[in-house]
Amino acid sequence: MAATIPVAIIGAGPYGLATAAHLRAAGVGVHVFGEAMAFWERQMPAGMLLRSYWDASHIADPNHDLTLDAYEAASHTAVPRPVPLERFVAYGQWFGQQVAPDLDQRQIARVEPETDGFRLMTADGASIRAGRVVVATGIAPFACRPPPFAGIAPALASHTAECGDFRVFAGRHVAVIGGGQSALESAALLHEAGADVEVIVRAAEIHWLRYGSGSQLHAALHSDRNPVKPLLFPASDIGPPGLNYLVDKPALFTKIPTRAIRGRAARRAIRPAGSGWLRPRLRDVPITMGTAVIAAKAGCGDRLRLALSDGTIRTVDHALLATGYAVDVARYPFLAPELLRGLDRIAGYPRLHAGFESSVPGLHFLGAPAAESFGPLMRFVAGTGYAARGLAHAVKFGVRGSGFEVRRTGSAPPELVSPNRELRTP
């Protein structure tokens, strides 16, 4: 008979690890599947810097003991601001050592419904029963490939999530498609790696975030000495003043009347933008704005021919698609068809209720798939606290339960340490 666990978490990124921390602190039995921070480590470009502020980059734990500051102290090394990708990955892996030292690195190949819960099949053939399943596997399957690039081989056109080391493009001509942080930072990294780069942006202009750009007003407003800073900028600081507070409080954001208005507010909060500290690194990179790729064709030897909406042609060695992600949970390969048939969805997103529970009792979704129901905060690390607290509360107190009795564990949870106790070293 297959082993039974109260809660299975699929995914060991920020959302999965934060949820494990909160559930274990609540005494709920949990089993976490996945490799800690795998997407961040393998599918984000080397050399990347986090755009989010320091206070918006902590992975949430119940006692606020496992912050970036705590990681700095435990590792005896300072973490630069902005936070480099490799340091954030190391922080997340350290966080995982504290809250999920028993992390199960096996991949989940399939999740099927059962009468009192779910059956999970691992890639190595093991069968595990779980009362609840938390899907926290991130956005990797949702990489958006624009229609002109359909059928183009990955050697000629790839998504930013498919290329972690830009040094392979040294000496080659690369067109970066997009106008947000991913596109602009990728262009800077490519240029610094020795590539000949052009950025092609559909929008008429690039929206620059002034963080780090040298703006004295911006620095003064964000200074900890500014007495009105808490009134202007919540810790997450997503979107312009005013809207940023709605985004920071999903319970308020979801009260915005009509889905259409909420959608406009969300798009305004997370519109494509680049950090101000990127501008000096792009001085020698040509940026063509107000132009879209309308056709792409392999040819000219091993090169790619791009037809642009302004009537011009580019022939490049590679097109790097910084074109974002389009959530569609049907693209999670492990969800069985019978689960998907019972899943109420809105444009690819699961419709979620209290505790981030879907229309399939006991099946929860975290991260970007929760953004339709709880707002754009769920797309960022800053949302881990709200999500993990809400899910842990619902599971502990049986809000919209699955019918499977969630049992409290008999042993103490992994050390969720207080500041005066010794942390596991990185």
Model-derived regions, located:
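Enriched - but not universal
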Residues: 43, 57, 97, 211, ...
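Flavin (primarily FAD) cofactor-binding/catalytic cores of flavoenzymes
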Residues: 2-37, 80-181, 185-398, 426
